[in-house]
Amino acid sequence: MQNHTAVNTAQAIILRDLVDALLFEDIAGIVSNSEITKENGQTLLIYERETQQIKIPVYFSALNMFRYESSQPITIEGRVSKQPLTAAEFWQTIANMNCDLSHEWEVARVEEGLTTAATQLAKQLSELDLASHPFVMSEQFASLKDRPFHPLAKEKRGLREADYQVYQAELNQSFPLMVAAVKKTHMIHGDTANIDELENLTVPIKEQATDMLNDQGLSIDDYVLFPVHPWQYQHILPNVFAKEISEKLVVLLPLKFGDYLSSSSMRSLIDIGAPYNHVKVPFAMQSLGALRLTPTRYMKNGEQAEQLLRQLIEKDEALAKYVMVCDETAWWSYMGQDNDIFKDQLGHLTVQLRKYPEVLAKNDTQQLVSMAALAANDRTLYQMICGKDNISKNDVMTLFEDIAQVFLKVTLSFMQYGALPELHGQNILLSFEDGRVQKCVLRDHDTVRIYKPWLTAHQLSLPKYVVREDTPNTLINEDLETFFAYFQTLAVSVNLYAIIDAIQDLFGVSEHELMSLLKQILKNEVATISWVTTDQLAVRHILFDKQTWPFKQILLPLLYQRDSGGGSMPSGLTTVPNPMVTYD
């Protein structure tokens, strides 16, 4: 893609995501305080504040909410520029029109983020360098899409231009890892973690590491060599672990090893020589308002959750047929003398070795693709899956039906027992053969949510999650509607709807037609599940009868974020019209 085309495309995408987020979340009453009218057949949302007026062309989406009709221009009263409207310019206009609210918003922070997001997306579109390995290519497309419908997703706060160049998967730049020696007395690990696996990674530099430690009067036998992300090594560890470094509990060694490429998550790094082996390490820049740490308790919780997932796969016929799980039990972490697992510091120095199912790694006839990659605005993966360049409407409808059917069958089969895996598109992968879904592969198990009453009803043991007693947690749920909210928001309104959105843009298939198909599949799959008898009607009511569904707010919480955000993406819940209800 030529540079000027890429710049215009990137600006249009970020503007669309911004306007959609404002509309979805009704920020500053942009929907509720507007007049809806039609001009020349186009629906317009007319928003007036402080004597200024904006006309936004909109359409009624399959989510039963207005979205920006981006093929038509937004009109800002008094604006005379012939240049296309940018997201940053539109945001500044909204802020200026709402001085009573915006004095509490992080206006400049958001404006900076929108500008950076557009700049980086333009670069990634113009310099997209696809890997030859189909799985790695899928990760690049998932990274290119990033978090669907999030206008600031492309901003990685804390990175310089040179960092984006190396650490964005789209640009296909591999890099070596650095090394920190961690004293064995200050380390914990997964229950079944095999230290040999970790040591095998650092074999190429073990001799040098031994000599360097000897030079400081230290013995390699007292330490474990941790792989460290080079950005983390340079910018974070010297400060966050200054005391431990002075006490030789942590020794930073200027050694490099291996050849790795960022995955779509940026923390999980793909071994170029063995693409189905990933090393997950902290990378504490800020993305989506959260620091990309890998807290120790998350890995412990992931280990517990993985046991539960495997137990359910053995128990359930549909899960046994369709689901495979990445092995994420091999992990190690620095641990202070106080054994305080809730310390933020720990999340800066951990490592996890993720292994994909061997049967997939050895199968050259399958394509393993994350659902997030299918939401990228590019035909390449669809052509690869279907095995042809010219894809008809019937082809893409059949493919979407297959994807939705398997995904919903798997998800609801887990949910009937009271377990809900991480459902956003980055962490659900689909294995295709001959254009059909064969397997659903789960990764990143640290946020498998549970509904205690259903686990108990099925005589299943509760995972021993490490959670703070003094703050709310999202892992353990006692309320059925709260449990289902994660499915409604992440699985349907984000993951599946993002794929619907991409198919509409790429192949011209109406999103309403695709959503109608999705509704029918969901109804069929819900009907086949053996829900806990006393809750059957409640499930149908939550999904199909209620007038509203929960909806994840992503922009509004960022407007009020004053700090680094810690390790969790700021979000809130609001309610929106139920997308499973058809409105005339």
From Swiss-Prot:
EC number: 6.3.2.56
Induction, as annotated: Up-regulated under iron-deficient growth conditions. Repressed by Fur under iron-rich growth conditions.
Keyword check for Signal: no
Subunit structure: Forms a mixture of monomer and dimer in solution.
Record GO biological process: siderophore biosynthetic process
The reaction(s) this protein catalyses: 2-[(L-alanin-3-ylcarbamoyl)methyl]-3-(2-aminoethylcarbamoyl)-2-hydroxypropanoate + 2-oxoglutarate + ATP = staphyloferrin B + AMP + diphosphate + H(+)
Protein name, per record: Staphyloferrin B synthase
Recorded name of the encoding gene: sbnC
Origin species: Staphylococcus aureus (strain NCTC 8325 / PS 47)
